[in-house]
Every structure is written in C-alpha cells, then in structure tokens.
Amino acid sequence: MTKTLEMLHDFVWGAPALVLTIGVGLYLSIRTGFAQFRLFPAAVRTFVRRFRPGSGGETGISPFQALCTALAATAGTGNLVGVAGAICIGGPGSIFWMWLCGLLGMATKYAEAALAVRYRVREGSEYLGGPMYMICHGMGEKWRWMGCVYSFFGIFAAFGVGNATQINSVISGVNGVLCRFGGGETPTGNLIMGIFLALLVGAMLLGGAKRIGQTAERLVPAVSAGYILLCVGVLLLRLDRVPGAFCLIFEGALSPRAATGGILGSAFQALRVGCSRGVFTNEAGMGTAAIAHGSAEVNHPAEQGMMGILEVFLDTILICTLTALVILCSGVTIPYGCDVGGELTTQAFTSVWGDWVSVLLAGALCCFAFATILGWGLYGIRCAWFLFGHRGMKLFALLQTVTVAVSAVLKTETVWLLAETVNGLMALPNLIALAYLSPELIRLTREYTKRTGTKPVEVTYAAFHQCKPLRTFSHEKVPSPGRCCKKEGQEDLSSEHRPARSAHP
C-alpha cells in the first residue's frame, strides 16, 4: 500500500507538476506586473485600516474573518511538522524552494481570491465562491465537468490534508509530551483524543461559515502571535547561528550533498520536497482559500485578492521561515533521509527553552490543527454542495466528524503521502482556470489601481453571480461578466454595460 502511494506521489509531484505550479505563478506574476510586490504595501495599509474583527453582515463574513479562515486552513501543522519534514527529506535547501514557491504563490493566491469574488454566487444568505464557480461561470458551462473534478478531489483532500494529517500530528505531539514526562502512547488514549476532537469539530461545522469565521478570527491571531514570539526568543538566544543557517539554506538549494554532509545528494529532491511542502503549507495553486475569500463582503475583488497576498506572506515567508531557522539554529541533530514529523521541531525548542515548552508547543499544535480542520471542513462542505446539494453537505459534515476519530490511529507516513498526492491532483483544474481567466484578473487589477500606480482607489464592487449578468450596487461603471454567465433573455442589471474582455489568454 505504502509503495503504491509513493509511486503515485512521485508521479503527481514529478517534474511536470512542479513546472506547472511554478510556471503558473510566474505567468500570473508577469501578467499582473508582479502585483504581489506592487500591491503589498497597499495590502498592509488596507488590512490595518479597514479589515478589523467583526461581523460580515447578512450575506457573508468579514474580510478579516475570511483571511483568518484561510489562514486557519494553511497556518496549521504544515508550519510545524511540514517544515521539519522538508528539512529531513530534502535538506535545508528545500526551504529556499519553499520561499520561491511562496513568492510566486503570492501572485497565485491573489488571483484565486480576486477571481473567487468576481465569479461567486449567492445561495440564500451566503456567498459561495471557489475554483468550481470560477470554472463554471468564468470559463462557461461546457467546463462544468472540470469544476466537478475539482470538487471531487477537494472532498478527498478535506479528509486527508484537512483532517487526517492534522489529527495525526496532534496525536504525535501530545504523545511526545507524555513520553517526556514519564507517560506513554496507548491506542485507547489516541482514540479518546480523536473522539473529543470529533465532537468539537462537529459542533463547529453545524454552525456554517459564520461560526467557523468567528472562531478563526479569535483563535488564529492569538496562537500565531504566541508561536512567533517563541520562535523569536529562540533566535535571539542563538543569534550567532542565524547567518550560518541562511548559508545552509542557500548552499543546500544548489548542493544538498555539501549542506547535509553527503547524506542527501539530489538538488531536484530539495526542489521537489520544498515545492510540495510549500504548496501543502500555503495551498497556493490549490484554490482552496478562494472558497473562504469568496465568502467575504468586500468593495472590489482585487481588495480581497490583496488579502491572499498577505495570507501567503504570513504563512510561508514568516511562520515557516521562523520554524526552519529555529531547527537549524538550535543545534539538534537532524536525521536526514528520515521524516520524524513534529518531533524534530519539539526537540529544537526544548533544547533551548527546556522540556516545559513542549507543553506549549503541543497546545499550539492542537489549536493550529483544530483551526485547520475547521477551515478545510468549510472547503469540503462547499465542494459537497456543488456536487450533491444540501444533502451532500450534511453527509460530508457527518463523515468529516467520523474521520477525525478514525485518523487518530492511522500511520503518519501513509497519511502524508496520501494528502500530498491529492493536493497535486486538485491543483491541476484550478491552475488551468487561473491561466484561462488571467485577462479578467488583469482587467480587475487595472480597474482597481486606475492605471495611476499602485495606490488603490475607493471602488464599490459588492457583486455576486447567479449564472446571470453581474449585479452591482455601486455608482461605479462596472462591466458585466462574459457571455458564459448570461442566459438568453436575461437583462443586464448594471447601470451602464461595458462588455468584459474575453477570458481567453
């Protein structure tokens, strides 16, 4: 079973997939004039000025809640466990490739979030967005099958990367703490922890997007800030080793053999591991965060797109980098070639702070994992609704809750292989859609900046789709969507209509 998964994983994350993931990120960066850098200062200003914790109103969640929900799904065990695994398997150089994927992924996530708002629909009292709606309404009904393929893999990914890997990491972290203080791992104890978490997850999923968003906006900032402070404390105490850690990262990217003492010798392995773990931790290219961002009430699609830029920066460039530096600066022995999961991260912190910090790490890991399960629970529910309607949502919520308990007794290696494999499979239709719809992304970006620089202007674009022309509640002259969203006989509801540019690249 494991060998079969390894073969499938290597095929999915082979050279073609890496070229596609990095290539689309580079393509979108060039087409938007490297919007992830031009709009970054504006994104920070907008976030500080306008996006504060609070209610999103009757039809959606607030932009801050959308960002926290997306971060809840990304800033999870990938930051603690995934980074350690990347260093063990791919060497320190894998962090360099994780950075590269992160920088290009900022453009990808910008596109995902902006287009999710552009092509979302309204169902009852909620906005529904994501790659499946981008594909259906942006590319046309003839591509609906590709949206169904994405939703199908999205449901399986919610059980894997958004559930099983998180619970597995929590169990490993808690058992590690118990072992340090004289306890031990027992199957019964694992199952009890799984059942307890399952009950919490089930209660949250029943509350829908609003309850998940409200939980995320309180949990994610607090836990992230605490973890960052722990990391900064370690680096201040080991400040003399920080330059050497950066040297290992850059040297390992081109010559893993030199950086790992001859144990790892493939530069492509460092690239492959860094990219696959990078996608796992920031999910740029997978399109999942677009589901959360598409639920936000914002004035313009590009405005929420900028929150996508911040999301990847906080997750990969900040938190993942801090984790990697802590491991490399702590002085712990790194078991190259053997993925030991979060135990390496725990050893790095305890070697500096002592065993007591393992309790804090286990608590942070539990909170991160719980938030990730909630975020992915929302993604899975949206995918199930797209495929099967309301009954599919209820069935998914039930299965997701049961899977939490079952995942407590699964093996780590099998879970991670399966999760990364499904990640690669669901990224393909999303990346195709992003490239196809890039002209509309460019138009939105230019409309937002008014071609006068990078300073954003106040534009009201609170719009939604229902497979009909764009409805706008603003004084701006906003174009209606392409013909693929307009049914025969429907009237344009915009005050003044200007046809959108063709979505063909």
Can you describe what each PLM-predicted range is?
Residues R31-Q36, G78-V83, G160-V170, V201-G213, ...:
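Transmembrane helix-loop junctions in multi-pass membrane proteins
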Residues L20-Y27, R31-V44, I167-V174, G189-L197, ...:
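Membrane-interface loop-to-helix entry segments
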Residues S55-I89, L115-R118, G124-M132, C136-G138, ...:
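Alpha-helical membrane segments and immediately flanking helix-loop junctions
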Residues L18-G23, W99, G147-F152, L178-G207, ...:
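Transmembrane alpha-helical segments of multi-pass small-molecule transport proteins
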Residues M1-T77, I87-S94, G105, A405, ...:
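N-terminal alpha-helical transmembrane segments of multi-pass membrane transport
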Residues F47-L67, G102, A113, V117-A158, ...:
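Transmembrane-helix boundary/entry motifs in multi-pass membrane transporters
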Residues L28-S29, C101-S125, C136-N168, N175-M204, ...:
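Helix-loop-helix module between adjacent transmembrane segments
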Residues Y110-Y119, G124, V232-L248, A259-G262, ...:
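Extracellular/periplasmic helix-exit of transmembrane alpha-helices
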